[in-house]
């Protein structure tokens, strides 16, 4: 790679936070409430735990191979060809993830804000922004995330804080509604699918200053982003109640709409919220796009990724335009999200187990001759 | 036939033989021994000049010699009194002694001439060049060597308050064009042997002296070497100003953002040198160039540091706000009016609609037209002579604002918005950075006109990403915000009290990190007045006595 | 690759820029929008129904019967007639435009409206929607769908029920404000700030309507003497149909049971032993609701604590000079409030309208009972008339004003 290893622990944490907080923040309460009604916060919490587990596995795996990304060390662990095949799966998955995120973004913008603008234009502009920014090296990548995180976190927290004035704690009870356990489990999977962006930690660890602190960075990353998601779910459920949320596509947006800055200076805060949300989506898209390109570069051992970033864009755009309408799109997102959990959690767990077995066997072999 | 076929004209233009070309061709040849030949060669190259002054005389009444110089550059008094006079009259201690030819030069230089800068040289090109710089050359018949003495005197303006950077609290000295005065201004502020000044000459025709100043032990060696390397790679006719150098050594010349900072103030230069930067000075330019820079320098002034920390922080916050305003305010206005009027309170929205009712074109066009006229007005006021300028600018603004509104060419709110934006852009102290933001306002306005608030966000993200990827001599442009640096952060938005910033910011990777001394600063302890202070004295006195004082040091 | 990579880049970027030339799709100048500030919905009368043109359907083949056609009156702000600065005296022109259309549903009516208005209709500043009582009694659910799907509509808009026809409200001309509908909207918005009504905006209406254990309520307005609007009570709903209204003082009592902190209503309390009364005004309230099951049947206990002040006494023969008499007034006021509350609850029980939200308390605190016996909103509305309740009111008179006697 040749780039100096300069990513600090704080930068790694902020990369995780801004990657995770993205398009999913808008429909999140809807998914949670569909699964668990008033126990939506509980469902969210379990989803966060599952995602945290996956992330810790990845971080631990990365710490055992601090110089390599998952593309290269998977080849070490399970053999060259098998590793390559799985890596191609991973790359395809992230390509699809990028396109779905871009499409969801376009759908929100075209429905809520710019109603006459064609969907293609909004999607292309965002993809163009991401692909142009991807031409830089990984240090600039982390600078960008580091810079935008406070701008993303602060307005969301402020909106949530102001909105609690209208909260009705009755809507949050009972906390654990044991009606539909299967539905709740499905909801848990959907929620943890929102955290899949954290897979990029495999790309970050080789460029970190102190890779052994990756676990600490992932812990804080999940804590902050998961905490924010939980807060949003609690706030929306408390203010709207689970029944009302089932009727709204983007409850978080409605939350911002209902909130007014005291003194009624600005009335429709959702426009400002959307502006900040554009930032969050950009960082998420940027991450997954960069991961795709970086991994492609490693898989095929290319020299640099600048041309690649332009090259991939038409594919992503094409995939983003595939879903027919917004309902179709959400079905695909749920399906692919859950399938993706196999790739982001099962596959690393599988790698870790095999890695353990190999090193245990190696230790045994070393111990023998003595 | 010849109409349709283009003949390639390969006629070579004859090359004019300019004196400099002649000098370049030959390399450094030694001068001949004969005086006549020497004078003839000089007249060949410089003879057409009115100010070439050749005075033939006899040294000690014996040896024929000639003094050659360009009279416009020299101090005639020095030439006459300190050089010609002692040479023509035999000095007391040499009367009656033997003055052989081969020892003559040594005798003259060490015992006769009343000048500290007398030196010996023999190459013809070198001597011509020295003459062009204001030195007087003494040719002696029969000796190869010649003596050259620095008699330079050029009219320069006096040190005055810098015009582009005015402050209320702080020193009022500014650099002038002469590089030796500028270096003097720096040196008296840094009486330490670590302050190093290296010079080089750049520019084929101007051969300008370029000085690289830094503090050894604080500035990072790699940066200094990089600066030298980039400067040595410049190959151009003329360096008339520091700006020329800037364009050659910048990391990314296509970026709208400046990656160096130029300043007219010596105190600002010294402050930056102490932080670990390198200053570049050019003879003939009253600006010094500072590298490497980060973005948050562009809204800081020396006044921030000379004032108390609350005052400095408050003013800095106002400046940051003005900076943000000058970038996005018109675009926000356009997106609110054309795309999302539901953000405005209802009564206001309806009233604004009333204000815009007569205007025949969309808000974007209106804003663009007024912005462009503001830019033209601004440029015009800079070029106007002072007497006409003041009145005309007031009239211009009033006319544009009031009359345009009444003619129905714009709505009153647009004028207010643009006026605030323009005023905001003046608040940014660094001219080059303010200009960058002024320029970037236009693309964002166009994006806002197409996409509304979403367009503004996309434009802002684009600009930020670009800034985050810039580097100035290896230092990331957005440090200390982006690669975060807790010491540097104390100076970004607010200006922390000086005693809270004990280390230099890390992004410059200085070799020596400590600003304040290791003992606790006793600043806040001065708050104890009266009884407490006496008590302190009884317990052994204050421990910090870092600044020695003595009676006879007024320098 | 191509010989000149830079040319390729330039060509691609030009290609990308071309779609931008086609224009700014969403840009619409603020003075070119027809800002609809208020809407009024009435039932369409016979002749009005005939006026409908074939704008959203051909012929008479849609399943919605003609008798349910609505008449929508919109108040649109006219740009240019409303000045930015202080108002010039002598503005004789009305700054708003009132347009009337009929339609089968709300969106249908909006489409018809657009046919009649030059600029594109913009609902982003819609502050208040007035429903006539007729329409409210018929059912409000048909409007909710349109209002929810449209992203321009704010959730903080106000929804009110009016005694007279809603069109009358749109044509009002109150002298206090330049734009009539803004006066109306401000008045409704300030109702909760002053303490005259619990917080109510359309978003809350929807939330309560969706929730399983509560029925919604809306302010009930009436016009007195041509231009004055009065808050005449609270309209309570069963599901989405209005079933009754309270009188104004009962709003205060309702707020007490709901636990709205800010007080605003005063009542005449008879001083025991005498024939005189004093006016006691509530300043703040604190409520605690407990739900239990008694013999398997739901029971609600409400405990309310009032903090009041005496604003006026009717005649000089009463002396408010010692705390004993204040105590007496307190007990008397508690008694009468308790009676009023019980009356109100019974009234709503008769109409099967649980505006107090007791059902929500049951659902939240006794989930087993809820899941076994109730589960749906309809079932709760059946059970509601049967529940038992007890009310305890505790008033404290903290202040008597500046007069010492």
Give, region by region, the residue ranges found by the protein language model.
Chain B
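Membrane-embedded alpha-helical signal segments
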Residues: 1-328, 343-346, 466-555
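Generic detector of multi-pass transmembrane helix bundles and their immediately adjacent loops
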Residues: 332-335, 345-351, 355-530, 536
